[in-house]
Design a protein with these regions (language model features):
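Outer membrane beta-barrel transmembrane domains
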Residues: 171-206, 215
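Transmembrane beta-strand segments that form the barrel wall of outer-membrane beta-barrel proteins
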Residues: 30-38, 61-71, 93-101, 108, ...
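Detector for outer-membrane/organellar transmembrane beta-barrel domains
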Residues: 112-183
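Short loop/turn motifs that connect adjacent beta-strands in outer-membrane beta-barrel proteins
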Residues: 22-27, 94, 165-173, 201-214
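Outer-membrane beta-barrel "beta-signal"
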Residues: 198, 204, 225-237
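Outer-membrane beta-barrel initiation region
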Residues: 23-57
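Cleavable N-terminal export/targeting peptides
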Residues: 1-27
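Residues that define the transmembrane beta-barrel architecture of outer-membrane proteins
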Residues: 26, 46-50, 76-80, 89, ...
Length: 237
């Protein structure tokens, strides 16, 4: 909980330094992604999946729901996430409640929040987008977190650097992600680079209201010595 308090206090302090033009009304967003493989922070979480997303935002504050369901195997990850976030200028801060169909609760109950028998993972994040470079830090602070080498809660963390650029009519992003210390959550025994990735996206429009981004990417995990090539597309409203 100390980590969460630090994130919230730091976010409030930084937010006070920004003056932004806020939106005048509540805005909504809907999207459905279809991916050939579910790759997250360098980890393989399943084969072909459908991933719906729904969100609302107002004056920098946002609430979103996101899910993932495997299409080819009953053993693939099923996931449902809720995220409360705030952004001002390039700064962002948020809290996410992840729920997976595997964890400490053998019955996979969603409304099971007991600290030692839940499938939920609670994560705080803070970051800044400089335009040419983005930095993001994530830390688990409650729920089904991993443990360190002493068997204690690891407060599993992940740090990511992203660099966007345009090339041959596509939007690209190069990403390097690392886990700073040992945790069973990411399968690391100390500091480890867990993702080196490159992704290309090209958008197509259907009428005036529907956008269809098509993307492909390569994600390598030097820690686990795995590499994944995936593709996907989304319908965005």
């Amino acid at each position: 909980m100390k980590v969460l308090r630090f994130i919230v206090v730091a976010g409030m302090c930084i937010c006070s330094c920004f003056v932004t033009k806020a939106q005048d009304k509540v805005e909504g967003s809907m999207a459905v992604d279809v991916v050939s493989q579910y790759v997250w922070r360098g980890q393989d979480l399943g084969n072909a999946s459908i991933q719906p997303g729904l969100g609302i935002s107002y004056k920098g504050l946002s609430l979103s729901a996101w899910g993932s369901v495997g299409l080819t195997s009953a053993d693939d990850t099923k996931e449902f996430d809720l995220t409360l976030g705030y952004s001002a200028g390039g700064f962002n801060i948020g809290v996410t409640d992840y729920w997976f169909n595997a964890g400490l609760d053998g019955k996979n109950r969603y409304f099971r929040y007991n600290s030692h028998s839940t499938n939920h993972v609670f994560e705080g994040n803070i970051g800044y987008d400089f335009g040419c470079l983005s930095l993001q830090w994530y830390t688990n602070f409650a729920g089904n977190d991993g443990v360190n080498e002493d068997g204690d809660r690891a407060y599993s963390s992940y740090f990511e650097i992203g660099v966007p650029f345009s090339f041959v009519s596509c939007d690209w992003e190069a990403v390097v992600g690392a886990v700073p210390f040992a945790t069973s959550f990411y399968g690391t025994t100390g500091f480890a680079v867990t993702e080196v990735a490159l992704k290309a996206t090209k958008e197509f429009s259907i009428g005036d209201k529907v956008t269809v981004p098509v993307y492909m990417g390569v994600s390598a995990n030097p820690c686990s010595q795995n590499c994944h090539f995936y593709a996907g597309f989304a319908f965005q409203l």
